[in-house]
């Protein structure tokens, strides 16, 4: 069953999901959870360790099981991992159970936000070396091109490039509340 007050935040790493998510949840009076953190708690180890020790298939299965558990919740904001929508089963589950919000940012802004992060595999070369900002921006563009068709299927799209955090939270709160009211009225 679809719960329109179950809000899934998607977007590229650096789009603001983890920063804005808790503030948005507070503004809406909802609970906040980070999907990756929930997976780590369930597995008892970090996502990097899950990938290294168990492989991507095991991680994707944990991701799906965690989403299935979350899918029955209401009044919750869930920050999704960057690649979750690439998994067809996860994508369909999210679309079927909640409201998907795409936090859209340009490759230029994302590369600026991510340039000092050292824990992101996408920011490293094949031998673990740090990439230049231009290389990071190019890599982000390539990944976004692949993910964009799924991102565009979101119920709401919010551009997070040049806004202050507070105004982004206000805009998202307004749009989500309006969306929930409209969908509930039309049901």
From Swiss-Prot:
Residues holding Mg(2+): 18
Domain of life: Bacteria
Cellular component terms per the entry's GO annotation: cytosol
Gene Ontology molecular function: ATP binding; magnesium ion binding; shikimate kinase activity
Requisite cofactors: Mg(2+)
Residues involved in ATP binding: 14-19, 120
Enzyme nomenclature, EC number: 2.7.1.71
Subcellular location: Cytoplasm
Keyword set, alphabetical order: Amino-acid biosynthesis, Aromatic amino acid biosynthesis, ATP-binding, Cytoplasm, Kinase, Magnesium, Metal-binding, Nucleotide-binding, Transferase
Pathway(s) it belongs to: Metabolic intermediate biosynthesis; chorismate biosynthesis; chorismate from D-erythrose 4-phosphate and phosphoenolpyruvate: step 5/7
Residues annotated as binding substrate: 36, 60, 82, 147
Catalysed reactions, semicolon-separated: shikimate + ATP = 3-phosphoshikimate + ADP + H(+)
GO biological process, one term: aromatic amino acid family biosynthetic process
Cofactor binding comment, as recorded: Binds 1 Mg(2+) ion per subunit.
InterPro entries: P-loop_NTPase, Shikimate/glucono_kinase, Shikimate_kinase/TSH1, Shikimate_kinase_CS
Chief location of this protein within or outside the cell: cytoplasm
Subunit-level organization: Monomer.
Its biological purpose: Catalyzes the specific phosphorylation of the 3-hydroxyl group of shikimic acid using ATP as a cosubstrate.
Similarity section: Belongs to the shikimate kinase family.
Descriptive protein name: Shikimate kinase
Gene: aroK
């Amino acid at each position: 069953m679809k719960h329109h007050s179950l809000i899934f935040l998607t977007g590229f790493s650096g789009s603001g999901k983890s920063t804005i998510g808790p503030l948005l949840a507070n503004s809406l009076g909802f609970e906040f959870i980070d999907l990756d953190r929930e997976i780590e708690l369930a597995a008892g180890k970090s996502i990097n360790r899950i990938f290294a020790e168990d492989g991507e298939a095991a991680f994707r299965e944990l991701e799906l099981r965690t989403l299935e558990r979350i899918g029955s919740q209401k009044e919750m904001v869930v920050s999704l991992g960057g690649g979750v929508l690439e998994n067809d089963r996860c994508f369909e589950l999210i679309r079927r159970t909640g409201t998907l919000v795409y936090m859209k940012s340009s490759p230029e802004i994302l590369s600026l936000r991510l340039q000092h992060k050292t824990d992101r595999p996408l920011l490293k070369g094949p031998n673990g070396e740090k990439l230049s900002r231009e290389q990071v921006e190019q890599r982000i563009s390539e990944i976004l091109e692949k993910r964009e068709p799924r991102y565009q299927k979101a119920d709401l799209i919010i551009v997070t490039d040049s806004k202050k955090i507070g105004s982004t939270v206000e805009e998202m709160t307004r749009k989500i509340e309006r969306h929930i009211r409209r969908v509930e009225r039309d049901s």
